From Swiss-Prot:
Listed name of the protein: DNA gyrase inhibitor YacG
Name of the gene: yacG
Protein family: Belongs to the DNA gyrase inhibitor YacG family.
PANTHER family: DNA GYRASE INHIBITOR YACG (PTHR36150:SF1)
Binding site for Zn(2+): 9, 12, 28, 32
Quaternary structure and partners: Interacts with GyrB.
Amino acid sequence: MSETITVNCPTCGKTVVWGEISPFRPFCSKRCQLIDLGEWAAEEKRIPSSGDLSESDDWSEEPKQ
């Protein structure tokens, strides 16, 4: 028999069963899922990078010839 895997909701910390019975996994609810999405949309969360490439001289919208 397989062991039940549980994780903590990243928003509120409640225990969530990792399986089809938890449609919002890893979140415990649609509310927690939307809170997390809002944090990403408001740029409160981000994936760390080694530097700011947006100001790089290597970026150009003109094709190289």
